[in-house]
């Protein structure tokens, strides 16, 4: 069988995913074909994700050429993919410093250490490679990627910008898009937006549109964010993250109807995202739909019983509607699930008080006091409750705190003085 026929047959087996046939063909291929054809097959296996087969081919080639550094590097990469890091490191460390492939080995080592979270060691390896090949763009790109991952955004941006002056893409990465991502990660949103818009001139992709919209939103350019997100929806209706940001953008322009419509559209696409239900609840309130707001907030809490923001929003609605039994039902359900959050104590205290369960009300007013000493509205309710219950010494303490945070309110000073004279 000719080389072309053998490779064609192997490609057909790969496309069919016929492992038994691949194994059968591979044995013959290794025995009959030339080394360069065998190496080409290893590359094909790696491209298709057949790492075990690629390792088998490279191991065979290593047997034939035990001192070939490139084979050691290639096999080390495959072994890392297979989770066999120890053998991969052994191969890489065998490569001599005088070898032309040594800088490449250093980069692979840096990638490994980077994956392990050993960033300082990874940077040392890249710097060593740069000391050998200071003008190699791919090494500068590798360092920029490492700096980006470790949060050194300005240093990374400088390297990416220098590289972008040479060419627009490295290792399949669009440098305009990467620069946008770096500046966005570093909260330089206006600069990020400029790069996203430049990247969109080269290619319109969902991730770039979303990045542009997010950066525009953070730059308070809400109309631009809306424009990008509406285009994103057209391009990819299942880009779930777009709907919340679109709704938030409409809300920032005070178009609450469109914000509500956008978030409901998002819920049709993704009915398991608690953040969508929370925002739907908020927008329902803004549109004067309290029953719908309660429904969406309850959905959010059902998805995550400890979703604090949704719980607080829901209990606030119930309290405003003076549905004190519902407040207590929600609060006690959370307690039964071992969810304790002091922000809910004032609601519980007020609800128990209104239901004339005064001992429970006192318990939660007392528990809430430490966290709400600077909240005048809470302290006012608490002091009146204490006075009603005849707890005058405690009322004096709370009045003293009210005077401290509202020194201009004579009412509290007068009440304190009247208690002093009783």
Can you annotate each of these PLM segments?
Residues 28-29, 60-61, 94-95, 128-129, ...:
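Canonical positions in the second alpha-helix
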Residues 32, 64, 97-98, 132, ...:
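Structural marker of alpha-solenoid helical repeat scaffolds
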Residues 34-35, 68, 102, 136, ...:
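Residue-level recognition of tetratricopeptide repeat
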Residues 37-38, 71, 105, 139, ...:
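TPR alpha-solenoid repeat register
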Residues 40, 74, 108, 142, ...:
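Canonical tetratricopeptide repeat
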